[in-house]
UniProtKB/Swiss-Prot annotation:
Residues 1-40, 96-103, 148-160, 210-243, 306-313, 359-379, 449-490 are extracellular. It comes from Homo sapiens (Human). Its main location: membrane. GO terms for cellular component: membrane. InterPro entries: MFS (IPR011701), MFS_dom (IPR020846), MFS_trans_sf (IPR036259), Sugar_transporter_CS (IPR005829), Tet-R_TetA/multi-R_MdtG-like (IPR001958). Residues 62-74, 125-126, 182-188, 265-284, 335-337, 401-427 are cytoplasmic. This is Hippocampus abundant transcript 1 protein. Glycans are attached at N12, N453. It is found in: Membrane. The chain crosses the membrane at residues 41-61, 75-95, 104-124, 127-147, 161-181, 189-209, 244-264, 285-305, 314-334, 338-358, 380-400, 428-448. SUPFAM superfamilies: MFS general substrate transporter (SSF103473). The gene is MFSD14A. Disulfide bonds: none annotated. It is a multi-pass membrane protein.
Amino acid sequence: MTQGKKKKRAANRSIMLAKKIIIKDGGTPQGIGSPSVYHAVIVIFLEFFAWGLLTAPTLVVLHETFPKHTFLMNGLIQGVKGLLSFLSAPLIGALSDVWGRKSFLLLTVFFTCAPIPLMKISPWWYFAVISVSGVFAVTFSVVFAYVADITQEHERSMAYGLVSATFAASLVTSPAIGAYLGRVYGDSLVVVLATAIALLDICFILVAVPESLPEKMRPASWGAPISWEQADPFASLKKVGQDSIVLLICITVFLSYLPEAGQYSSFFLYLRQIMKFSPESVAAFIAVLGILSIIAQTIVLSLLMRSIGNKNTILLGLGFQILQLAWYGFGSEPWMMWAAGAVAAMSSITFPAVSALVSRTADADQQGVVQGMITGIRGLCNGLGPALYGFIFYIFHVELKELPITGTDLGTNTSPQHHFEQNSIIPGPPFLFGACSVLLALLVALFIPEHTNLSLRSSSWRKHCGSHSHPHNTQAPGEAKEPLLQDTNV
């Protein structure tokens, strides 16, 4: 009996210690200083900088592990990860409303970075863990909730923009650094460095990041129930057909983001394998594209919104997306990829413009619901797009015969056609499929009114909206302003 009491006391002490890791006595956030956007920025930068270092090594390991069906397996791996993220993101968001953001920042960063050290230990385990890590690979969702906790509504657009710009900045520099270190010292050093940066990120969250969700905003008990309707990933998608304008916007988003998600997952692999880009050239391409995308989503977007209006900006962005996908599809020379990349950067204005249209036309109490639907559709595309692109590459027999030599200069490369089937007329079939999909999106977007009010008339919608209009769940317009270079694991 005495032994049982001792065990019970030890268990109680462990529970109290776990609570104190996140919240100090009296409910004061633990960490360095008050919660700020800069805490979120550092977390995002370190996580994606670590993954960015592995851009070139991942391409090599992917081909060595799956030499016969590289594109297909890449699509399946990223597709499984995307679908798991889509299914788990609402639940993790709902749980973070109950238990706070810090614990889930720690959880998502840990599991997102868990595959990194496995790259050299066991490639098979590396790709297996990448697939299942999608359950927790939702750092952005938790970070945006963290930012929403500590900012006023009018400040969130700028705060989200800062987070997105930091994400882009990490990808502008890290692939080039990783490619250089890999060429000089070997890929093993790059993996060790990426692992160290991931551990630094975890330590930073444990020691320096204060909890952002006030104690008074949480349920009194750790065992408090969560809203399972809020945790349902299909809840917002079920509401799509209840308003014709919302339906048009969501169809436009689905048809345009499906090929974009597939492109994110495979394009750098395509440059490396089919177009014979060296690791340094891929890194330079990512850097240039990231810089141009930031410029397009800030300066150019602002000018276009003022000069030609919201709807026309969306149409222009879709037009650029069609052009760049067609160019990627038919392009057979490296210089064509660089030229199409500039057009691709311009196409990144589409989703900020879509989000701005929704923000401007939806009622204040419906912002979270409509933005949540768009986010849900994009999450679904993150699962379907990579698998679709991988399958199209597979059925057209676009596969690698041998990797180009590291450090090869693009100006002296032989014809890239030697890297795919000789009877292939179209170098990049999935990109042409994507261009057709975006063309359909453009036709649908023509029917979206420039000035309208998203009056969601269904009483069930109104009831649903009431449960989603919590300030921590509302997605500000800036949340959709993501950089073009979203995928960092390939």
